[in-house]
Amino acid sequence: MSSSVSPLAPKTVPDMPVIAGVRLATAEAGIRYKNRTDVLLAVMDKGTAVAGVFTKSKCPSAPVEWCRAKLKGGKARALVVNSGNANAFTGKTGRSSTALTAKIAAKAVGCSESEIFLASTGVIGEPLDATKFDGVLGRLAETAEPGDYLAAAKAIMTTDTFPKVATATVKLGKAKVTINGMAKGAGMIAPDMATMLSFVFTDAPIAPAALQALLKSGVEDTFNAVTIDGDTSTSDTLLAFATGAAAEHGAPKISRASDPRLKAFVKAFNQVLANLAEQVARDGEGARKLVEITVEGAKTKASARKIAMSIANSPLVKTAIAGEDANWGRVVMAVGKAGEPADRDKLSISFNGIRVARSGARDPDYDEAQVSEAMKAPEIAIKVSLGLGKGRDRVMTCDLTKEYVAINGDYRS
């Protein structure tokens, strides 16, 4: 957790409404540091549906493995999140810690261990002492209230400089339903199916299979379209919980993701995911500039995504942006190395709406002073036009600064 807030942080924080069927509490358990809030417990009412997407890393954390196994049941009563220790690459000890944490949480909440979901973030490779949860989770279960999402978001931060929350309210049938979300990120972010840690709660009555389909679809153009440093975490987890409490106020029970009554809900749900994903990009470690990369005219959307990610993950592109240099040559390099169809002589590039390259060469109207001034902006939009087809996609990233090196060089110390 940084002491200075990113200059890209949102100027305002939304008021997070209560969601019926969800109670939250946080505590200091001394997971890695003293005098730091590092545990979150979310308690959900019986019958709450759960869905999740996770890292595709071949070295997943013990909590990720636990959640994947329990997701099959489709129901959740509690979520336990700790910061400071990822419980990843910890072998049998890590799996035992996960099992013990779930056992303690189940006893505290009064449910089956199969209804407990877990997430950990922090240092990889160090054993997690799950006995630190003993007593703590019991107290949290007793004191949990349907309230402070901002405090909950703070509890899961590591190198984040600000808590990330988002909310939306929408009609489902004749009833109002609420969607609240929180996330943490900052570094080791190049998601594949999920990203970092993020948790979304709603009172909509949506069945587990339908919620899973909505989540899997929703992450594709939100969390999966964000990268900070090209490194996919061992712990990436996105969980969604639907308490169904809005059914008491007339919200229809939804069993299929294709139900037309979900149209407005899906839009709001995806907006919450997009909001959280952008906040993650805004809080990239050491970031001073938010970068949006759009690739159009590709053969396919998938091809456009791959090229956009190649640009977004290029250290040379990212450091040029940090230096406020519209170095389109580095963008050309990143396009060429992506391994996707591209024609040098059809390529056009612009920075913040100013075209710098056209048809494979520098734009004849290029004005160095104009472009240099545009690069001073805190938000940079790079557009690449390939001229090959109709494929288009957009990804978010940030610049790469000296602060990123300092943060990660000192991470374990």
From Swiss-Prot:
CDD domains (UniProt xref): OAT
GO BP, sorted A to Z: L-arginine biosynthetic process; ornithine biosynthetic process
UniProt xrefs under HAMAP family: ArgJ (MF_01106)
Name of the protein in its database record: Arginine biosynthesis bifunctional protein ArgJ
Organism: Bradyrhizobium diazoefficiens (strain JCM 10833 / BCRC 13528 / IAM 13628 / NBRC 14792 / USDA 110)
Any one GO MF annotation of this record: L-glutamate N-acetyltransferase activity
Pathways per UniProt: Amino-acid biosynthesis; L-arginine biosynthesis; L-ornithine and N-acetyl-L-glutamate from L-glutamate and N(2)-acetyl-L-ornithine (cyclic): step 1/1; Amino-acid biosynthesis; L-arginine biosynthesis; N(2)-acetyl-L-ornithine from L-glutamate: step 1/4
Gene expressing this chain: argJ
Subcellular location(s) per record: Cytoplasm
Family matches, as InterPro entries: Arg_biosynth_ArgJ, ArgJ-like_dom_sf, ArgJ_beta_C
Residues bound to substrate: 158, 184, 195, 285, 408, 413
Site features described as Involved in the stabilization of negative charge on the oxyanion by the formation of the oxyanion hole, chain residue numbers: 121-122
Reactions mediated catalytically: N(2)-acetyl-L-ornithine + L-glutamate = N-acetyl-L-glutamate + L-ornithine; L-glutamate + acetyl-CoA = N-acetyl-L-glutamate + CoA + H(+)
Residues flagged as site, Cleavage: 194-195
Family, similarity comment: Belongs to the ArgJ family.
Pfam families on file: ArgJ
GO CC field: cytoplasm
Domain of life: Bacteria
Lineage of source species: Bacteria, Pseudomonadati, Pseudomonadota, Alphaproteobacteria, Hyphomicrobiales
EC number: 2.3.1.35, 2.3.1.1
Name of the top EC class for this enzyme: transferase
